[in-house]
Every structure is written in structure tokens, then in C-alpha cells.
Amino acid sequence: MSDAPVSSSAANAMWGGRFAAGPDAIMQAINASIGFDKRLYAQDIRGSRAHAAMLAAQGILSSRDAEAIGEGLLTVLSEIEAGGFPFRVGLEDIHMNVEARLKELIGEPAGRLHTARSRNDQVAVDFRLWVRDQCDAAITGIEALMQAFVAQAEAGADWVMPGFTHLQTAQPVTWGHHMLAYVEMLARDRSRFADARARMNECPLGAAALAGTGFPIDRHMTAAALGFDRPTANSLDSVSDRDFALEFLSASAICALHLSRFAEELVIWSSAQFRFVRLSDRWTTGSSIMPQKKNPDAAELLRAKLGRVLGAAVALFTVMKGLPLTYSKDMQEDKEQVFDAADTLMLGLAAMTGMVADMQANRESLAAAAASGFSTATDLADWLVRELDLPFRDAHHVTGTLVARAEARGCDLPDLTLAEMQEVHPGIREDVFAVLGVANSVRSRTSYGGTAPDNVRAQAARWKELLGGTA
């Protein structure tokens, strides 16, 4: 594809009736959006074909002209997809580039296509169609990643690992339970994209510049042709609304945040200090000077790249926050933010899916880490409540005292003798040691949503079924 220049006179042909001179070159550079909005070509052509068909059905356009327009637009589509379409900066945007080429192909009927339409409602429908398609793509990408996490959860339903708070060992959990935590996050992400898609599925085409049109158009016809549930109900809102883009960016930002959190965990877990996971060679790189290195570059790059999605959301909120109704040229700055966020998110989902599918948990390191750091202290406190009828606060104090003694001895809680424990509370019995093992600890967490292996297996099976059984 090329971005060919165009003369000022040609540039004015679309809107220049009241202008005596063409735009300054710098103005043209500021004004042109074809460098990025050419990505909307398929949606623009689809919207124009639906509009032409409706105009013909309403008797506003002859069937002969409508047929010529429809065939001409398909030719333009083929030219763009073949890679040889001469995009021209002077024609400003994708709408004018398509229309100008259509005029070259079919002549005078091309000028009738814009009847009862403005670029304001044209770009609104193009952009909505594109974002709607991206919601579908995001949902598909999220589901693939969910399946990868479910497969890990299914395999490691009873692999014990430490659960953390403040990045310090807190309580034993299972590998599968940790994997399913991300499935839950991603399920909410999927729901947010689905909700956003449902809300944006109204068609602004036919709102014209801002006030509607006096032509007897059928907005329900174009809405149905483009797969929308209904036409938008207020022409002012139709052309000034970018909530659909903001919602897409908001959902993308939260999803990116979730991906970034797991990327951070992969960086930590794959380090020599943790050795919780082995990352595939496909997702790591080496060092040019240190032969022993295997760097988690994919995870690190995602951790950084995904910040762009959050930045894009803030940028578009900033653009929109001070705009009066209806359309302002500021709104041309909406697309680059959405395009970049969508590209980054889709790359992140694909890369993370590959890393999760390929990673191997180091069960020995996980189990050893789970058994350290007094991870079953809460189990001891619970035992004191259940078996000795201590108030939990008293049990907490007794357990804390025992932890301090073990720490002073340089050992863990199971390494204390019964006599040492009875010095702190004489009611402690031999059977207390059963609750201090990490395997028993996770098996005991049978409350709904808890980390017990049977719970994990049940949840993994549930998600596998919900996701189509392909996990």
C-alpha cells in the first residue's frame, strides 16, 4: 500500500465548495488520518454497501446506481486487500479515499452514495463495527488462555505450593487452585467484553451530521444489514458517542492488568531463587555474555507492553472529557489508542497462552517452598480452636508464640517437640502434628472456593465443560 500525495484542488473536491485555497501542508499533515484509519476499510465498505442498498430500497437511489455502487465497492475492497491500493494523504481519511476511488471506477453514481449521510455517522458506524469485531476477537483469545490455565489446573490439582501475601509464604495451596484464580479473572474479562459488545450493538448510521436527515431513510434496514440490534435513538448522541471505545479500552486495560500480573509471577517463579516453573525455550532467550542464562524475556516484555493498554485508556478518556456535543475533530484521536490497545492485548493473549501451555511446574521446589515459612500456622490455630475450644484470638497468640520459638531454634513448626509445644499450652496433644503437614492442610480447605484438591478438580471439570471440553 502507498500513501500518495494529492493536489490541493483534488483535496477540496470533497468538501471545498466554500474554500478559495487548499490547506497548508502542515494543516494537511495534522488533518489526515489515512495513515491509521485505513484499517477501517472493510467496515467502511460494508457500511457503504448497506447504505446504498437502503437508499435504493427507499427509492432515493436508482437500482442501477445502487448496483454500480455495490459492485464498485467490492472492486475497491479487492484492490485494498491485494495490497496495491493508492491511499492518498490529501484525501484525509479512509472514507474519502474509498469514495474517490469509487468515482474513478463508476463515475457520477459514486457522488450519490453520500446522500443522507455524513462522515460523522459514517465514521461512527465504521468504528463501532471494528470495535465490535475486536470484542469478538478478544473473547476468543481469552477463552484460549482460559483453556490453557484449566489444563494446568487439571494436571496439578494436588500439587502443593505456597500461597503468598506480601510475597511471603502465607498458607499452602495447590498449583491447580492458583491456575484457576486466573481462570476466574479471565472469565470476568470475557464477561466485560461481552457486556461492552451488547451495549455498543446499536447502529448510528443515518444520524447524518448530527440532526438526522429529511430523506425517507430506513435506519432499521441498515442496522439489520450490519448485524446491529437496533438503530441508535438520538442523532446527537449517535455521532458524539465514544463510550463503546472507552468501554473496550477499559475492558482491555483490566485484562492487560491480569496478564501483566501473571507475567510478573512467571518472572519470579522461573528465577533460580524460586525454581517454581521451567519456561519453554520457545518463550525465553539467552545472554550474549553469560552462557548459563535463560531469561524470561517474553514475560518481561509482556509486563512492559501491556502497560500501553492502560495508557491508551487514559489517553482516550482525556480526549473525551472536555468535548461539547456533538462531533469535534479531537475525536479523530480515538482510533490510534484503540488500535494500539487491541493489537497489544491480542499479542499478549496469544503469547501468554503459549507460555502457559508450555510451562512445566517444578513439583519438588513447590512442595519444599510450601513446607517452609511456617505455612501451616493457621492450621495450628484452627486446631486449637476446634480441639481445645480456645477463642481464635487466644489461639492466634499461642500459635504466634510457637512460631517465635521455632524461629529461634531455626526450625519449622513440625520440628518442635510435643514437650516444647506444651510449655506454651499444656492442652496440646500428639495429634496436633497431623495438621502441620502441608498435604493435610490443603486437603482440609474444603469450603466452597477453597484449595482442597477435590474442589480444584471439580472446578477444573466445570470450566472444561463451559469452555467446550477442549482444555
UniProtKB/Swiss-Prot annotation:
First-level EC class: lyase
Family: Belongs to the lyase 1 family. Argininosuccinate lyase subfamily.
Main localisation: cytoplasm
Annotated GO CC locations: cytosol
PROSITE patterns, alphabetized: FUMARATE_LYASES
Family annotation (Gene3D superfamilies): Fumarase/aspartase (C-terminal domain) (1.10.40.30), Fumarase/aspartase (Central domain) (1.20.200.10), Fumarase/aspartase (N-terminal domain) (1.10.275.10)
GO MF term (any one): argininosuccinate lyase activity
Localization of this protein: Cytoplasm
The name this protein goes by in its record: Argininosuccinate lyase
Organism: Cereibacter sphaeroides (strain ATCC 17025 / ATH 2.4.3) (Rhodobacter sphaeroides)
One GO-annotated biological process of the protein: arginine biosynthetic process via ornithine
Pathway assignment: Amino-acid biosynthesis; L-arginine biosynthesis; L-arginine from L-ornithine and carbamoyl phosphate: step 3/3
Reaction(s) catalysed (UniProt annotation): 2-(N(omega)-L-arginino)succinate = fumarate + L-arginine
